[in-house]
């Protein structure tokens, strides 16, 4: 507990002192105002707490899997249909919680395209099994934007055991999600979120890598397609090799159609067959060396 920082409440009385596990997510100023992580607060006396207003708009839906396709070696795009007549009123940058029942999943049963199977075989991942005896809930950011209605789309990276010790447990939820097929039913709840764009004219700089693509795509599509923003927007994305890049055509099209948008990719381990002539290295270093380091006012940007 205390690792995701998503269960913030304001404790007005009765919560005791803030714990060290909470300080990675709550500043000293916020702590003085009573901000706490509810999962870390022991209820020993009567308490007075204040919950975020959006919590009371949370609902559950039983969705149906439309598709569950690999977008990279270890990342799937899970696309689910919302029940007819229903709406998940989320904002770009928001997230839902997804539920997994107790399950026994064999990685050898996964539908992994041939182009990605080499790494799975190399690391021995097809020998892995995930056995979970209880219901599990995890949070994932939406990759679709609100305008892409009727669906919930997630980018999920599988949490495999480390190759050096495949006897260690695999990620409970990601192992389950990778087993889903079209037509399967999945229960979600939401919407939740705090990672929302501010209503300013400031430049927007998006930085992400891997499955961190999801909220970036949601925000950027929302800004450019729905809001038709005139703010300067750039996206800096990190991937291991060219094979791990996805949504390339989408972002190329956005850059072509919007003169205020540009996007850049850095590969940390480009392969010879990639014939890569773009940025190399880790994306946080690349953006510092090639953009923010020479930016006239990086502190004014919205990240």
From Swiss-Prot:
Recorded E.C. number(s)?
7.2.1.1
One MF term in the entry's GO annotations = 2 iron, 2 sulfur cluster binding
InterPro entries the record matches: 2Fe-2S_ferredoxin-like_sf, 2Fe-2S_ferredoxin-type, Beta-grasp_dom_sf, Cbr1-like_FAD-bd_dom, FAD-bd_FR_type, FNR_nucleotide-bd, NqrF, OxRdtase_FAD/NAD-bd
Q: Where along the chain is [2Fe-2S] cluster bound?
A: 4, 7, 39
Family named by the database record: Belongs to the NqrF family.
- Task performed by this protein: NQR complex catalyzes the reduction of ubiquinone-1 to ubiquinol by two successive reactions, coupled with the transport of Na(+) ions from the cytoplasm to the periplasm. The first step is catalyzed by NqrF, which accepts electrons from NADH and reduces ubiquinone-1 to ubisemiquinone by a one-electron transfer pathway.
Its recorded name reads Na(+)-translocating NADH-quinone reductase subunit F
User: Which organism does this record belong to?
Assistant: Moritella marina
From which lineage does this chain's organism come? Bacteria, Pseudomonadati, Pseudomonadota, Gammaproteobacteria, Alteromonadales
**The gene coding this protein:** nqrF
């Amino acid at each position: 507990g205390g690792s995701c920082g998503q269960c913030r409440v304001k404790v007005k009385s009765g919560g005791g002192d803030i714990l060290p596990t909470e300080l990675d997510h709550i500043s000293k100023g916020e702590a003085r105002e009573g901000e706490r992580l509810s999962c870390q607060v022991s209820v020993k006396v009567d308490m007075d707490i204040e919950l975020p207003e959006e919590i009371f708009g949370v609902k559950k839906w039983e969705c149906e899997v439309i598709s569950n396709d690999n977008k990279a070696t270890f990342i799937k795009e899970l696309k689910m249909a919302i029940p007819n007549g229903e709406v998940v009123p989320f904002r770009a940058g928001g997230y839902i919680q997804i539920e997994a029942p107790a399950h026994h999943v064999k990685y050898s049963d996964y539908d992994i395209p041939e182009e990605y199977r080499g790494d799975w075989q190399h690391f021995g991942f097809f020998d892995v099994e995930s056995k979970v005896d209880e219901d599990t809930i995890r949070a994932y950011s939406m990759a679709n934007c609100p305008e892409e209605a009727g669906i919930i789309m997630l980018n999920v990276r599988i949490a495999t055991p480390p190759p050096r010790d495949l006897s260690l447990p695999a990620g409970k939820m990601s192992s389950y999600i990778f087993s889903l097929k079209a037509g399967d039913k999945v229960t979600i709840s939401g919407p939740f979120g705090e990672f929302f764009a501010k209503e300013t004219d400031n430049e927007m700089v998006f930085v992400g890598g891997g499955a961190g693509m999801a909220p970036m795509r949601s925000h950027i599509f929302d800004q450019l397609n729905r809001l038709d923003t005139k703010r300067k927007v750039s996206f800096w994305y990190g991937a291991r090799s060219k094979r791990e890049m996805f949504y390339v055509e989408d972002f190329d099209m956005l850059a072509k159609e919007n003169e205020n948008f540009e996007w850049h990719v850095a590969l940390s381990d480009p392969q010879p067959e990639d014939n890569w002539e773009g940025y190399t290295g880790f994306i946080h270093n690349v953006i510092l060396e090639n953009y923010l380091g020479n930016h006239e006012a990086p502190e004014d940007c919205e990240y």
